[in-house]
Amino acid sequence: MAARTIAIYGKGGIGKSFTTTNLSATFALMNKRVLQLGCDPKHDSTTSLFGGIPLPTVTDVFAEKNALNQPVSISDIVFRRDIAGFPQPIYGIELGGPQVGRGCGGRGIISGFDVLEKLGIFNWDIDIILMDFLGDVVCGGFATPLARSLSEEVILVTNNDRQSIFTANNICQANNYFRTIGGQSRLLGLIINRDDGSGVAERYAEAAGITVLMKVPYDADARDKDDSFDFAIRLPEIREKFQKLAQDIVEDRITPCEAVGLDFMGFVRLFGEVSDDAPQPATADELFGRKQGDSGSETIAQKSTLDSDDQKMNRCIEKLTAEQQEVYRMVEQEKKAISEVAELTHREKSAVRELLSSARKELTRLFFEG
């Protein structure tokens, strides 16, 4: 039987990995074979799960193996931990990503899933795969489980602050969008972590039509457990909450939500009255520091420069030969392919390329020398 796949999304720093880790541990205590998949470039999802030991990431291992022209194997990137008192080992993977400022995190997620799918991840003898996903960025890579229906179910994690709820709302909207174009991921509901009793996240959930699955109160002892790379479910009051949620998931007691998310104005009005007035525009005078009565000649001059460049280019094009003009306009302005231009003008593709090349060289000369 294929593994049950659940993507857990939330704003960075709100306890998303804490939630995922303790849910993984709870499933393992229920004799389920669990794989926790860290899908954040920070690659810290499984740190507590593995007692503080960092896992080599798929991104790094793939780069090293690729440099040596060697294939990536399961044992290179999948790790297990046997824990006393747990009937099943817990498995972990960190996708990782590029170093800060050196690449695209979303692209790293896409590439990581490509590697895992080639290794047959969805055919492994695993009961549940929990995917711990960053939800802060509007990036197609981080929406991979939703876009490709790699996760059957989605759980949102939030606190009672506006920014974390806003992130949850964005993910809800994204999941709804992908469902409208054939996506199969179902939204199970919302977990409120570090609940302060203010009820803000609950008001949002009610307005958006999202089920509140669990409320985890702020607990200093739970924080200390996590900070020392241990499980908060060792605390009875925390364990009880996670056990109930895990049991509800396993026994299919949760009805998926049909929520589409709130639009922006509907969202912000949850936090207070907001005026319908349009924002007040700034003026060029105040930004350029002009005194009242000065002309706006800088703005006009800047626009004139842009206009004159376009006009100059058009004049240069008109100086090309008729054949060069025809090919250049079709390729550069009408965005036709070389093969299409060749067919329309009854020329060989090589002839079209030569005309295009000569036209570009001539335009460069005319524009900068004219």
What residue spans do the PLM features occupy?
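Conserved catalytic-core segment of NTP-binding enzymes
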Residues: K118-I128, F133-D224
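C-terminal lobe/tail of nucleotide-utilizing enzymes
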Residues: Y177-K291, S295
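A short pre-motif secondary-structure segment
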Residues: V327-V331
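DNA-recognition helix of helix-turn-helix
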Residues: E343-E369
